[in-house]
Amino acid sequence: MNTVFNFSSGPAKLPIEVLQQAQQELCNWHGLGTSIMEISHRSDEFRQVAYESEQDLRSLLNIPDNYQVLFCHGGARAQFAAVPMNLLGKSKIADYIHGGYWSYSAAKEAHKYCQPRMIEVMTYINGWRGIKPMVEWVLSPDNVAYVHYCPNETIDGLTIDELPDFGNKIVVADFSSAILARPIDVSKYGVIYASAQKNIGPAGLAIVIIRDDLLINRASTKLPSILNYQLLANNKSMFNTPPTFAWYVSGLVFKWLKVQGGLVEIEKNNRAKAILLYNTIDNSEFYYNNILPVNRSYMNVPFYLANSALDDLFIIEARNAGLYALKGHRVAGGMRAALYNAMPLEGVKTLVQFMHNFACRYG
């Protein structure tokens, strides 16, 4: 089989070692004669999977003891609703930092449950797009329920690497496309949530990391049980049947990350991949990227051809060369390469060589 490199932004590439282990165990998991997909989530065997998954994630992210880890249904879009429904309390106002498509989408969903105050932080300087430094963000007074932002915008290719320092405000972050890509200080956040299908595992699962004090006396009485953080925490994420296969594969990914050397090594690899691709774009007149270097995402690299009439041909020839899912999002156009943890440096080198060859032939 020819080597294929999948640059999809999600569902995204999984580590080949994880896929091979899941394949090997699929029909006879741990000698039980049955699949992991068929055993009860309340069995001792699956409870061990759940326990190890949580402990490995805690180890990777250095999650403090006063935080709960929830394995939830529904991906990040479900959390767009769950966050305000769980956290509003007496205040019906929340600050939403508008740094791109997904932060705007979160605010739009939250509007059904609260009054989101949109804080514009995007900047445009001589055709370059970027994000204002946090010190320039004009937040609401202290009576807001929380401050929500998205550290990495997959469609826009924008990242916010600064750690939030907003005093006593509760900070909520959508880390869907940045979780496990580098070390983070979890204690700076009240809630971190992330859909699985980018850097964690298969689609259908979301992980929520929430500080203990935010589980008490905040949730709306009309909150659906499946979205109730306190109820999920009290039942160890098993109030109802969880997405067990996605949970299991995510656990394998956590173990794979530890074998790679943890998040310090993962960050080095991710930066090396992104720098190689950005340098190729910047040193070419055939391709361009309009994001300020300080705000360029290391996970999602959008780029454009100077001659957009060649876009479709680029996609076709790239796929023929084993480079999949490079077409940009429908709202942004152009190209986009997702460089999540499972993408090897070899994949980016292959993409860069293809880009050189394509530019030589059509430039």
Curated annotation (Swiss-Prot):
Q: Might you report a single GO cellular component term? A: cytoplasm
Q: Which family does it belong to?
A: Belongs to the class-V pyridoxal-phosphate-dependent aminotransferase family. SerC subfamily.
Q: What does this protein do?
A: Catalyzes the reversible conversion of 3-phosphohydroxypyruvate to phosphoserine and of 3-hydroxy-2-oxo-4-phosphonooxybutanoate to phosphohydroxythreonine.
Give the organism, scientific name: Baumannia cicadellinicola subsp. Homalodisca coagulata
Which protein, by its recorded name, is this?
A: Phosphoserine aminotransferase
In the record, what lineage is assigned to the organism producing the protein? Bacteria, Pseudomonadati, Pseudomonadota, Gammaproteobacteria, Candidatus Palibaumannia
The main location class comes to: cytoplasm
Protein's cellular compartments: Cytoplasm
Example GO biological process: pyridoxine biosynthetic process
Q: Which GO terms describe its molecular function?
A: O-phospho-L-serine:2-oxoglutarate aminotransferase activity; pyridoxal phosphate binding
